[in-house]
Amino acid sequence: IIMEDAAKARFQSLAFRAVDAATAFDDLPDLYQQMGQALDTHTEKGDFQSVGDLLDDYIRHLNEKPQYIRTGLSKLDENLHLVPGNYFVIGGRPSAGKTALSLQLAAGMAKQGKRVCYFSLETDPATLEARLIANQLYAPLSAVKNKTLSMNELDRLADMKRWPLYIRSAAGKGVAWIKAQALRMKADILFVDYLQLIHERGSSDRYNAITEISIALHELAQTTGILVVALAQLNRNAARAEPSNSDLRESGQIEQDADAILLLSADGDTYFSRLTKNKEGRVGNAGLEFDKTLQRFTCAVT
């Protein structure tokens, strides 16, 4: 009862702030998020668990097959064991295939019945939809843009209408707003394209701003259980050599926070993919090939 009274008091305080004329409009998503947390009095996960209890739990579920979130690319899934609450970063220079890969992964996860929210801070939803159509139909992006698809190809798009995949523009928005929208949509997975474009007020220093954004995305994943997939730009010198985690633009915090990092690079028409951080599996060549015409990644034949 005491905990419930405290939660109500906290909720009322936040509600008064929300209707206060002095409260900035951009602060409302963060207040909305805090109000939801205030009413949830049963999410505390900080209590101790003995190793014996943890061992019993492990043995009890020994015969259950792990339920990882699949990407749809078998070579990636062999090593990238994504679970709810992970923070997965896909880094690359412009035109290395970051957006194409993220859309393909989002579609693959939606096909599994996962509710996926895709937040784009750079590209409008209609342009992303064109890339997604090309990817799913194995059709040239030019045919999609010029609207020269056959009726047979158009008929094959019917399944896409049933996917729980939602795309929206997030230009100029911050992490609190993204979190509030994802919670409103009951998302299992959210994509952000891309991290360095997220707007956070209050920090004039770019390094500190990106550091705070990465920390906030990591906390979002951990506190909500949503799988967060964030695209990230690489520094310009990454174009001249095989990229590494240190090339993640403007902050080393991204490397610190991420559960896994996949870096994409290109040399002319040849594309490379490498897992450079992976808490739950091996690192190294991810074994992916990119067809820019079809906007589609496939597993390399070995």
Sequence positions of predicted segments:
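Short, small/acidic-rich helices and loops at N termini and domain boundaries
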Residues: I1-R60
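Amphipathic alpha-helical transducer elements in NTP-driven molecular machines
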Residues: K8, R70-L73, A126, M151-L154, ...
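The Walker A/P-loop phosphate-binding site
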Residues: K45-A139, A176
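Cytosolic-facing regulatory segments adjacent to core modules
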Residues: D77, G108-K186, E200-R201, A286-K292, ...
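Phosphate-binding/switch region of NTP-binding enzymes
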Residues: N79, S95, L149, E212-T302
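Hydrophobic/aromatic beta-strand patches that form the interior of the parallel beta-sheet core
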Residues: F88-I90, C117-F119, R168, V229, ...
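Structural motif
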Residues: V89, I189-F191
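Walker B catalytic acidic pair
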Residues: Y194
